[in-house]
């Protein structure tokens, strides 16, 4: 869990609209060549091994033929605190899907619900029908590592999927205050005047994944301080289903 020390030690994702520690790091960090090289290696390893937040499913997805633009819309759990504090006019998955569909009538729109919402979508016929009115297809048990290489754009509210898409060089549109939005890497549907600095993706990785967090790795029954590469390199196979890494802000 990442905590924001600037506002009462509350979780950072609950303080999206206020100054926070990570934003301060990204605004002020002076990135060295060694830091950026480390970030490049880490990013390339993540992408090369197909690692995402949710792993384990090997189902494949085929991009439709003769379609110029495919947009992936990624839903969230609507009770997520980041949606309470980090969005403005669009606060629901249906609202996001409608906005994307209405603004991109020429695109093939793929909707990926959050894994915890997929079962609800499957079991609620009326809700499923309403969502399907605004997309060309909905996919559930398919990983982002399978989808992202095959789409042109990703649209999110505050989902971490937008960050994962940036790691893979995709165009990302944000409809909320994500930690990775506002730095010149995304198309931002809400203003973020507190972030005037322009970053590239490796500077974002260096700040958000290396400089800001503190990592603890459980190895042989002992918890040790580490960097993000160590557990990744030591246990790629097991990390796909059982993450071996915890992060906490000191």
What kind of region is each of these model predictions?
Residues 1-250:
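Catalytic-core helical/loop segments in enzymes performing group transfer/polymerization on anionic/lipid-linked
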């Amino acid at each position: 869990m990442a905590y924001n020390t600037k506002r009462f030690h509350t979780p950072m994702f609950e303080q999206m609209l206020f100054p926070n520690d990570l934003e301060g790091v990204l605004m002020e960090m002076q990135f060295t060549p060694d830091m950026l090289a480390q970030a490049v290696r880490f990013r390339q390893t993540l992408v090369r091994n197909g690692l995402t937040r949710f792993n384990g499913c090997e189902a494949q997805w085929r991009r439709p033929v003769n379609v110029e633009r495919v947009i992936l819309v990624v839903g969230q759990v609507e009770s997520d605190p980041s949606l309470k504090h980090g969005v403005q006019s669009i606060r629901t998955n249906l609202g996001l899907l409608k906005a994307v569909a209405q603004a991109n009538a020429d695109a093939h729109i793929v909707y990926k619900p959050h894994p915890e919402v997929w079962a609800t979508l499957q079991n609620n016929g009326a809700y499923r029908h309403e969502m399907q009115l605004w997309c060309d297809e909905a996919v559930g048990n398919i990983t982002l590592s399978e989808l992202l290489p095959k789409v042109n754009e990703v649209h999110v509210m505050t989902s971490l999927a937008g960050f994962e898409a940036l790691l893979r060089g995709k165009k990302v549109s944000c409809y909320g205050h994500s930690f990775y939005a506002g730095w010149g890497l995304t198309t931002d549907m809400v203003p973020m005047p507190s972030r005037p600095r322009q970053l590239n993706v490796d500077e974002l990785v260096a700040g958000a994944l290396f400089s800001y967090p503190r990592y603890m790795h459980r190895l042989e029954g002992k918890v040790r301080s580490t960097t993000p590469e160590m557990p990744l390199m030591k246990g790629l196979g097991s990390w796909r289903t059982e993450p071996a890494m915890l992060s906490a802000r000191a």
